Amino acid sequence: MVVTRSARAKASIQAASAESSGQKSFAANGIQAHPESSTGSDARTTAESQTTGKQSLIPRTPKARKRKSRTTGSLPKGTEPSTDGETSEAESNYSVSEHHDTILRVTRRRQILIACSPVSSVRKKPKVTPTKESYTEEIVSEAESHVSGISRIVLPTEKTTGARRSKAKSLTDPSQESHTEAISDAETSSSDISFSGIATRRTRSMQRKLKAQTEKKDSKIVPGNEKQIVGTPVNSEDSDTRQTSHLQARSLSEINKPNFYNNDFDDDFSHRSSENILTVHEQANVESLKETKQNCKDLDEDANGITDEGKEINEKSSQLKNLSELQDTSLQQLVSQRHSTPQNKNAVSVHSNLNSEAVMKSLTQTFATVEVGRWNNNKKSPIKASDLTKFGDCGGSDDEEESTVISVSEDMNSEGNVDFECDTKLYTSAPNTSQGKDNSVLLVLSSDESQQSENSENEEDTLCFVENSGQRESLSGDTGSLSCDNALFVIDTTPGMSADKNFYLEEEDKASEVAIEEEKEEEEDEKSEEDSSDHDENEDEFSDEEDFLNSTKAKLLKLTSSSIDPGLSIKQLGGLYINFNADKLQSNKRTLTQIKEKKKNELLQKAVITPDFEKNHCVPPYSESKYQLQKKRRKERQKTAGDGWFGMKAPEMTNELKNDLKALKMRASMDPKRFYKKNDRDGFPKYFQIGTIVDNPADFYHSRIPKKQRKRTIVEELLADSEFRRYNRRKYSEIMAEKAANAAGKKFRKKKKFRN
């Protein structure tokens, strides 16, 4: 394991600066994770002496202090005993000015390897060791010293809060994962300068770097040698920018957690702005050098667009129009610049003011310097894309997301002078190397933070995720289902006749059609982007169906007046709802014809000539005599008991009926409760009916005969009646006593007669 002094110096810089300034902070997670994971170095004193000048320039929030106390623990200075004493002084100077050294950033949920040196994590995440440790740091030191000037100018400028990041996690398009391997090399090459072309917002770290650059007028980078002469304010600001880039790299990596490096240059590595250059260049595996060469070739075409894009950053009117242009140019330029900086020995001295114009001028100078050695550096710079996936392996908690990346354009001394005018700059996360294969665009609408940068930590920007993929397919599928659902079930109103006259919809079919139409209308309202041609066809179909339903409803209302509408023409069916004898059906009869037929039947009944006319002995008279009419009326009258008895008919006499009538007569003579007229006792009645007595509900409790006591016949009822039996016994004893008295009197008379 190679532990460099540069990493050690960087850790001391960040720890000291984080400890000294505990008043204001942004993106606290990366700030505390960085000093903990950095390795030791013998050049600690040099780095600390260089950082003391600008420690107070770094604002931090209480969240940063809390996070720091959690992760770093007892590492206020972040120094450890040096393990590599042979590293040159140039490396230590380089580590001070460059914030791309080996860094392991540890969050709550994941650990991100920024550098190739093995480091320890707080959460005991698996350590990732570098695959190539023998890569010469002398070459990297001066190359990254050039990049340090670039990274200080170009920082990630997007303000992302926890709410937006939580939305972006669920809204990133998974279709971008297919392009990750093709873009991995380009991603690594453009990680530190990702926002050079599309810097939509200036952060606090950007303003601090602008300060550092104004103070860095004495610092010079020697192109031939590996040593750098860098002022102390530059070192402190480099450490600050290192920490800031850590925070922003982690935030966008958390946003793109499902697809590790799909949103390459704009999401994941634009926020790592300038700290990852050593991470990429010290890796051993070169996965896709051809695409990096192609991206370097595209730099010549888009080199002229850098200055235009820098001007567009300061203009609010041209922000939305140049969105795709900014994406293309920034991607290609960053790729070429990434590969050219490790071998570029030319000095890059950037002098910037607090205003954005000086920043863009310095960017153009940097790009001009970088373009010199892009072809010589394509094959020499080893790139490993596994570092890209490491950002997606680690996760951050919700508390960390709230305090992580709050990119605020804040300047401690001059807030009003720096105004980058980035109100509603749309930030596209789709990589351009895929060239039109991305189906989704991540639109981050960020608010204006010109002078109120301190309060912008509490702001929550909205994240708009527009899905363009699969809408036509879903629309076509909906139309297909409509065509299947629109099949109508019809009923033949004239069975057996012509089956193509009238067709009616059932009530269920009508309800289902109306429900389908309502659902489809709601779906059409919800869909924001649909093809106009398909939509017009659907509307035509709906209009035709509505016309058909309206016509059928009008017919159905005219059929019947009953509450239950069967949906059939009852009159056409001859007054029958269901007729199984379709052959004998007499349909469409008019009332006039029916009246005429009735009259014919009546006349035929009175006719003398009948089918059996030949069998008669004489010709029957046409009109009957009065006597005959009286006989007929009498016969008809005798059939019923008359209107007084409601037309009660005489039943057919049977033996059972005769026995019942006899019992009734006997009871009449023996039961004092019954009284019958004398006329009713003679013979049997002619008109009578035998029925069952239905109990009144009120008689259920007081005058009801239980089921067990009910008898089958009248005789059994009489025998079961206790009162009737008592009465019968008494009468029987009286009769018997009378007979005995009569018999005794007769005997007495006879004896007396003999005596005489």
Curated annotation (Swiss-Prot):
There is a cross-link at residues 217, 220, 257, 316, 321, 345, 384, 558, 584, 606, 626, 649, 658, 686, 731 (Glycyl lysine isopeptide (Lys-Gly) (interchain with G-Cter in SUMO2)). It comes from the Eukaryota. One of its GO terms (biological process) is RNA processing. Residues 1-99, 156-261, 510-547 are annotated as: Disordered. Its main location: nucleus. Forms a ternary complex with DNTT and core histone; interaction with PCNA releases DNTT and H2A/H2B histones from this ternary complex. Interacts with ESR1, ESR2, PPARG and RXRA. Part of the small subunit (SSU) processome, composed of more than 70 proteins and the RNA chaperone small nucleolar RNA (snoRNA) U3. This is Deoxynucleotidyltransferase terminal-interacting protein 2. It comes from Homo sapiens (Human). The lineage of its organism: Eukaryota, Metazoa, Chordata, Craniata, Vertebrata.
